[in-house]
UniProtKB/Swiss-Prot annotation:
GO molecular function: fatty acyl-CoA hydrolase activity; identical protein binding
Enzyme class, spelled out: hydrolase
InterPro entries: ACOT13 (IPR039298), HotDog_dom_sf (IPR029069), PAAI_dom (IPR003736), Thioestr_dom (IPR006683)
Pfam families linked: 4HBT
Designated name of the protein: Putative esterase F42H10.6
Entry similarity comment: Belongs to the thioesterase paaI family.
Annotated signal sequence range: none
Length: 169
């Protein structure tokens, strides 16, 4: 329509990066002291968030290690699952999710005291699925220690993620 202008009530207000980060900090704080399997992410702290990327950090501690004294592969796989799902959850808030595929390649060892920077990228969000990848880097030298990929299906008639009540956490 010529001469038509949208009213300010029609405009969608996008959250700021600070608001997105604050939301993810609240979500990860809910994992602290969790009694379910998400407790493996209780030492993870979000540091940067966009609609397509979530960057977190974690200091590797003794409870994260395998018998050889390096970061346990199961810990890395679970963090790939949790952090990539949270990256999708930044924009997909009205749907439950389930893993369809999860794969991790382990490249270098990580030891106690190492700080990991974990970056999850949302590659594509479709009508029924989302595709992500994840990189684990040692902050001390920037070298990649692991690379993961995670495909998620959106569940019909399931609750979405709620920061307030910790649904799916």
């Amino acid at each position: 329509m010529v001469g038509h202008s949208e009213s300010s009530t029609d405009a969608v207000i996008e959250p700021t990066s600070e608001e997105l980060l604050a939301e993810q900090v609240r979500v990860f704080n809910k994992m602290k002291g969790s009694t379910n399997f998400n407790r493996v992410a209780e030492d993870v702290y979000p540091v940067e968030v966009t609609k397509s990327k979530l960057v977190c950090e974690m200091v590797v501690q003794h409870q994260h290690l395998n018998s050889k004294g390096t970061l346990h592969g199961g810990q890395t796989a679970t963090l790939t699952d949790v952090i990539t799902a949270r990256a999708v959850g930044v924009t997909v808030k009205d749907k439950g999710m389930a893993s369809v595929e999860l794969a991790v390649s382990y490249l270098l060892p990580v030891k106690v005291g190492d700080v990991l920077e974990i970056t999850a990228h949302v590659l594509k969000v479709g009508r029924t699925m989302a595709f992500t990848d994840c990189e684990f880097r040692r902050k001390s030298d920037g070298k990649m220690s692991a690379k993961g990929k995670h495909t998620l299906a959106f569940l019909p008639n399931q609750p979405g993620i709620s920061v307030e009540n910790g649904t799916q956490f």
